[in-house]
C-alpha cells in the first residue's frame, strides 16, 4: 500500500512521495507534508521558472530564488508568476 500524507498544498490525504527528494530540513518537511501530485505540479512550475527566467542551477542566487519560490508555492499557497505567461485555456 502506498504511503499517504495530509498534503498541505492540496488540503487532502493523498499519496506521498516515495522518498525524500530534497535535502535537509526542508526536504523532510516536503516528504512529510507534500503529495506526489503536488510535487508534480511544482516540478512543472519549476521547469517554467528555470526556462523563462534563464536560471542557472550552478548559481547559488538562482538556486536560492528557486527554493524560495518552491516554499511559497507548496506551503504558502502563492502561485508562481512568470511575466508574460498566459495559461492555455481548455477547449470546451
Swiss-Prot record:
GO CC terms, sorted: cytosol
Keyword Transmembrane in annotation: no
Membrane-spanning segments: none
Molecular-function annotations in GO: iron ion binding
Top-level division of the source organism's lineage: Bacteria
GO biological process, any: cellular response to oxidative stress
Gene3D superfamilies xref list: Fe(II) trafficking protein YggX (1.10.3880.10)
Keywords, alphabetical: Iron
Keyword Iron part of the UniProt annotation: yes
Family, per entry: Belongs to the Fe(2+)-trafficking protein family.
Role this protein plays: Could be a mediator in iron transactions between iron acquisition and iron-requiring processes, such as synthesis and/or repair of Fe-S clusters in biosynthetic enzymes.
Protein name per Swiss-Prot or TrEMBL: Probable Fe(2+)-trafficking protein
Organism name: Shewanella halifaxensis (strain HAW-EB4)
Amino acid at each position: 500500500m502506498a504511503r499517504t500524507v495530509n498534503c498541505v498544498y492540496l488540503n487532502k490525504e493523498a499519496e506521498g512521495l516515495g522518498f525524500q527528494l530534497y535535502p535537509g530540513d526542508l526536504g523532510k518537511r516536503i516528504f512529510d507534508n507534500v503529495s506526489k501530485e503536488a510535487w508534480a505540479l511544482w516540478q512543472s512550475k519549476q521547469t517554467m521558472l528555470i526556462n523563462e527566467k534563464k536560471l542557472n542551477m550552478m548559481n547559488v542566487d538562482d538556486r536560492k530564488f528557486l527554493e524560495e519560490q518552491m516554499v511559497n508555492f507548496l506551503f504558502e499557497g502563492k502561485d508562481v508568476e512568470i511575466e508574460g505567461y498566459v495559461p492555455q485555456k481548455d477547449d470546451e
